[in-house]
């Protein structure tokens, strides 16, 4: 299994997701048969459930992962359709019922969850359902806003969230605002306060840094960022290579795809330097069906490096036909089996357009 400490496999680093094999090197090593609204489905046992906030993000990052995920076949970004709160919560509750035997980890992502007025109800539902390993990914800008008598950060920690991932592109406040095109984001002092409060309440903060040429793009930049995180009290950082788009659905002229291709700092040279640096201690490799992760220890911190390629989603689905690797609850309440915006939904069947069983064929 690939999550055992101390056993590094060079071939996995070289091939990344192309080496992914459920039985040989995945975290769970097996699949599980489920019934989704009466239809059989074979599911990877460590599949995650992502809940997509329909709240439009107040940042305009030129490297935005969501804009790559929701780009249609013409290369145009499709803004998410948002169901009413009651319908969305009913759909989420129904999906959690169907996924009970799987007991997936749950991530809330965006859009921008910290600005979503539905977030308190979403988190309350997850808490009532005893959802496993709740993670919220945010740019942090709305964490001190009050909803229903408490701050958004209060709601996140009060729901027992395991992690809060906070996007931060630069150690410098002004540069971070410029890179993320978000003048109203958290400054370093505010970020430090979020880290302090979340940590004290049992929710582990993790800073997320996109690797970009001219910004954090080499070992020196990584070390500077880690020192910045440590000063703020964070003990968990992830460095992400800019995601590769799916060429079948995203035009190379798409502005986000073009930016990512031009600004992508390569992860491989950084990983080679990490391997040679005695201050880093290897922990594990994680193989995903379209992503590859390495986890290292550094000065009491967990340091994560990730590379992902959206073009591998369809490739891996053909390689493992009938297997669902992850679940996504879109902002319209429909449950999907990938991030593809136009994928046929799995359910619930009472939502219009959720009857097609294409993702289940071959299960």
Predicted features along the sequence, with ranges:
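Mobile, glycine- and charge-enriched loop segments
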Residues: 91-149, 187-219, 263-274, 299-302, ...
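Flexible mid-to-C-terminal extensions adjoining Fe-S/redox cofactors in radical SAM and related proteins
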Residues: 3-5, 16-18, 32-36, 40, ...
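Canonical Radical SAM [4Fe-4S] cluster-binding loop centered on the CxxxCxxC motif
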Residues: 18-91
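Core AdoMet radical
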Residues: 48, 52, 68-87, 99-116, ...
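Radical SAM enzyme [4Fe-4S]-AdoMet core and its adjacent flexible, acidic
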Residues: 174-189, 196-318
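Non-catalytic positions within long, well-ordered alpha-helices that form the structural scaffold/packing
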Residues: 99, 127, 157, 227-230
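A broadly conserved sequence feature marking short terminus-proximal activation segments
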Residues: 2-33, 290-295
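Short, solvent-exposed loop/turn segments at secondary-structure junctions
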Residues: 58, 170-171, 212, 243-244, ...
């Amino acid at each position: 299994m690939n999550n055992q400490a101390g056993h590094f496999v060079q071939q996995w680093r070289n091939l990344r997701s192309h080496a992914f094999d459920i039985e040989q090197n995945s975290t769970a090593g097996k699949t599980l048969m489920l019934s989704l609204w009466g239809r059989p489905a074979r599911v990877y046992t460590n599949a995650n459930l992502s809940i997509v906030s329909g709240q439009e993000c107040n940042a305009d990052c030129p490297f935005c992962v969501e804009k790559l995920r929701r780009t249609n076949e013409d290369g145009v970004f499709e803004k998410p359709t948002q169901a009413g709160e009651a319908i969305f919560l009913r759909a989420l509750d129904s999906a959690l019922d169907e996924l009970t035997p799987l007991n997936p980890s749950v991530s809330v992502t965006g859009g921008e969850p910290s600005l979503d007025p539905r977030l308190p109800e979403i988190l309350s539902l997850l808490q009532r359902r005893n959802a496993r390993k709740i993670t919220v990914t945010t740019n942090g800008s709305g964490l001190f806003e009050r909803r229903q008598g408490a701050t958004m950060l209060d709601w996140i920690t009060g729901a027992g969230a395991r992690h809060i991932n906070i996007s931060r592109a630069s150690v410098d406040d002004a540069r971070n605002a410029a890179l993320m095109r978000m003048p109203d984001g958290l400054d370093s002092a505010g970020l430090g306060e979020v880290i302090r409060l979340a940590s004290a309440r049992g929710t582990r903060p993790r800073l997320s840094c996109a690797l970009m040429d001219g910004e954090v793009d080499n070992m020196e930049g990584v070390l500077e960022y880690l020192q910045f995180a440590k000063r703020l009290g964070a003990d968990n950082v992830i460095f992400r290579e800019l995601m590769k788009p799916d060429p079948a659905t995203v035009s190379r002229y798409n502005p986000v795809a073009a930016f990512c291709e031009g600004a992508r700092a390569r992860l491989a040279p950084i990983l080679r330097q990490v391997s040679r640096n005695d201050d880093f201690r290897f922990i594990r490799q994680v193989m995903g069906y379209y992503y590859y992760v390495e986890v290292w220890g550094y000065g009491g911190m967990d340091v994560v490096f990730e590379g992902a390629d959206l073009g591998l989603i369809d490739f891996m689905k053909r390689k493992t036909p009938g297997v669902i690797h992850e679940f996504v609850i879109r902002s319209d309440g429909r449950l999907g089996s990938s991030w593809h915006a136009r994928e046929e939904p799995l359910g619930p069947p009472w939502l219009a357009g959720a009857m097609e069983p294409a993702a289940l064929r071959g299960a």
